[in-house]
UniProtKB/Swiss-Prot annotation:
Region (Disordered): 132-160
The protein's role, per its UniProt record: Required for rescue of stalled ribosomes mediated by trans-translation. Binds to transfer-messenger RNA (tmRNA), required for stable association of tmRNA with ribosomes. tmRNA and SmpB together mimic tRNA shape, replacing the anticodon stem-loop with SmpB. tmRNA is encoded by the ssrA gene; the 2 termini fold to resemble tRNA(Ala) and it encodes a 'tag peptide', a short internal open reading frame. During trans-translation Ala-aminoacylated tmRNA acts like a tRNA, entering the A-site of stalled ribosomes, displacing the stalled mRNA.
Origin organism lineage: Bacteria, Pseudomonadati, Pseudomonadota, Gammaproteobacteria, Pseudomonadales
GO terms for MF: RNA binding
Protein name stated in the entry: SsrA-binding protein
Gene (name only): smpB
Length: 160
């Protein structure tokens, strides 16, 4: 009997810009409808989520702006579109909750990360409210002060 291959674990791609641009209020886990070449590319880690977002229409969720680079060894029979829209699989209750929240002013739905869950590829999407420029500066200032505090705590223990 052939030896089973282990699936890679962990995160495939992250959207770090979304954490900077939005106040994240709630996160959801969604499945993705992918073709074979896309799964192969994701195994190789060839994905980018920068500027990707989720559009809700007709009771379905669609992932826009994600880029999955096709492998050179992929099939030549299928024309690979790296930035095609991909359907997200969510429960009906989750879709209704997202649609109600996005209908409010200032709320949007963004893709945060792609990751492996057992043998399936999942997309973490988040409901967020856009930050203003001064909010972004406050976040950076707060992060820097926390780093400085941690640094002094580490150094204080070494001095004794």
């Amino acid at each position: 009997m052939a030896k089973q291959k282990k699936h890679p674990t962990g995160t495939i791609a992250q959207n770090k810009k979304a954490r900077h641009d939005y106040f994240i209020e709630h996160k959801f886990e969604a499945g993705l409808v992918l073709s074979g070449w896309e799964v192969k590319s994701l195994r190789a880690g060839k994905a980018h989520l920068t500027d990707s977002y989720v559009l809700l229409k007709d009771g379905e969720a669609w992932l826009f702006g994600s880029h999955i680079t096709p492998l050179t060894t992929a099939s030549t029979h299928v024309i690979a579109d790296p930035i095609r829209t991909r359907k997200l699989l969510l429960n009906k209750r989750e879709l209704e909750r997202l649609e109600a929240a996005v209908a409010q002013k200032g709320y949007t739905c963004v893709a945060m990360s792609l990751y492996w869950s057992k043998h399936l590829i999942k997309c973490e999407i988040a409901l967020g409210k856009g930050k203003k420029e001064f909010d972004k500066r406050d976040t950076v200032r707060e992060r820097d002060s926390n780093r400085e505090l941690q640094r002094t705590m580490r150094n204080k223990g070494k001095e004794e």
